[in-house]
Amino acid sequence: MNNSTDAVNPAKKPQTRREKREAAEAFLKNVSDQSFPNSKKVYVQGEIHDIKVGMREITLSDTLVSGSKDKPVYEKNEPLCVYDTSGFYTDENVEIDVHKGIPRLRETWIDARDDVETFTSTHSEFAQQRLDDEGVDEIRFEHLPKMRIAKKGKNVTQMHYARQGIITPEMEYIAIRENLKREEVKDATLLLQHKGQSFGASIPEQITPEFVRDEVARGRAIIPVNINHPECEPMIIGRNFLIKVNANIGNSAVTSSIEEEVEKLVWSTKWGADTVMDLSTGRNIHETREWIMRNSPVPIGTVPIYQALEKVNGVAEDLTWEIFRDTLIEQAEQGVDYFTIHAGVLLRYVPMTAKRVTGIVSRGGSIMAKWCLAHHKENFLYTHFEDICEILKQYDVSFSLGDGLRPGSVADANDEAQFAELHTLGELTKIAWKHDVQTIIEGPGHVPLHMIKENMEEQLEHCGEAPFYTLGPLTTDIAPGYDHITSGIGAANIGWYGCAMLCYVTPKEHLGLPNKEDVKEGLMTYKIAAHAGDLAKGHPGAQIRDNAMSKARFEFRWYDQFNIGLDPERARTYHDETLPQESGKVAHFCSMCGPKFCSMKISQEVREYAANLDKNAIKIQLLDETITLTSDEAIERAMQEKSAEFKATGSEIYQLAE
């Protein structure tokens, strides 16, 4: 709870695979110490259910309001609550051992509904093969939980409960979490907010459990919580809620150990990932995923076709429905919360991509396109879609209907193939809803700024307001190495228009696999984009954190400025590069302008000058006369004095600090 942050580690960054694995192991041994400076985990008690909802509370310093140097008078600033995706990793009262997994928050909720049964023998042939393989004993997660499946004839999805009029613990949890104790804020300055433009979204002033239930029942929001992922803290994806951000992790045939992937998971949740997609394509996918599931406080998504392809040695033509079905069951039993399934890549749409500049850029889309052409048959994900629904509703796995024909360049944006697939995804959504299976729709991609809004409008019209989930979109193709920025611009815009979740893009996009720092950079960019979208929509309470920052900035509360920000570590590091002394943390100026020409310092002096007046006027004794000024005149006089001071020191905007 102190204001200091650890110094930047000057040690050499790990380079070899062995060094990276050792660094990841060291990180995971200290995984319980992931808290932010001057922050603590707080819990809000439920009213309908016996639940405790975690969020992060930032303690702020007091504001100097009057008094003298010897006897200052301070005014307390109330603590600031912010959304927290880090789970128990930032609770100093909970000791985490990644070899055992994190606490199973939802286990009693799931069992209390009495519509699931447990089993110990997997229903997946491949999963059984892995369990029988002694060669992977060394890397296997040891503390495997019991698996759950719906009882015969039961549907265990949150959408099914919502349509029965049931408010589940998950729904109340989400309502409390989305509100962030906003009703307790007393400072009127913090509650200031501009009216937004919501483009038809229906965002209430206060999120209630009933509102959550209704949105899920309508299909306008999803709660991705597999019954086999009891460690997951409930969250919601929908345009009438806070915009969410997804981070991608995953090993490949040439990079990353299990330790590194778990480290990336914990790292991602610390920096604000609302969900994480495991896109692993290398060795030991099954074992890696088990470690991730047992240690994840956020929903985990996958693209099952990637693992199915591994099972046929990378030959797309050899894929079968039976192999894919077994993969779905394997992953559902492990607890995967949502599947990206490219069921909208139809045989007749593939020729539409022939004239594109970049063709089919989606890995899953290209796999299914190749299968369709090789067999000259319709996509088996499409023809077996209802079979997939039957599997998903037994575990409450949500659909993330993949955009396999998304544009891979701005030249291909909004073309015939992209929108043909989108319309098909809308048709499939209706089928999923018939089974009460929760569904979101994936979107592009590469789209120039002026064409983004059309994507949102097209999706809302054809997909029944199911939540939209987009990769960016990237607004230009000219900046490899900076595509977190090119896409962050598009993400902020489409979030404003109604997109419910944004998939981050890292600086390594199109260039290589991201490391830890790339993951953080991508997340920071997308947390900014999501927040900007919430502000633009006028989401209730979205501006509270901005107002707290502005107040701290104007009052030169430097530690509070660091701590209120999304990345306190970087804020402090950048500040200390110029003003490293402790005195720089209490100075009433910053390094930009120095003490003489700090705009906020000048504004404060003008305020103080005016505050010393009587309510209406002040008498000022000059050499040869006494004059009376009104408050407005006094402020004008103060401004004139500052003008003269500015000219006397050379009329330079920036001057060296003394």
From Swiss-Prot:
It is an enzyme of class 4 (lyase). Its EC number is 4.1.99.17. Pathway: Cofactor biosynthesis; thiamine diphosphate biosynthesis. [4Fe-4S] cluster binds at residues 590, 593, 598. Its cofactor is [4Fe-4S] cluster. Residues 1-22 are annotated as: Disordered. It catalyses: 5-amino-1-(5-phospho-beta-D-ribosyl)imidazole + S-adenosyl-L-methionine = 4-amino-2-methyl-5-(phosphooxymethyl)pyrimidine + CO + 5'-deoxyadenosine + formate + L-methionine + 3 H(+). NCBIfam families: PRK09284.1, PRK13352.1, thiC. Catalyzes the synthesis of the hydroxymethylpyrimidine phosphate (HMP-P) moiety of thiamine from aminoimidazole ribotide (AIR) in a radical S-adenosyl-L-methionine (SAM)-dependent reaction. Homodimer. Belongs to the ThiC family. This is Phosphomethylpyrimidine synthase. It comes from Colwellia psychrerythraea (strain 34H / ATCC BAA-681). The lineage of its organism: Bacteria, Pseudomonadati, Pseudomonadota, Gammaproteobacteria, Alteromonadales. The gene is thiC.
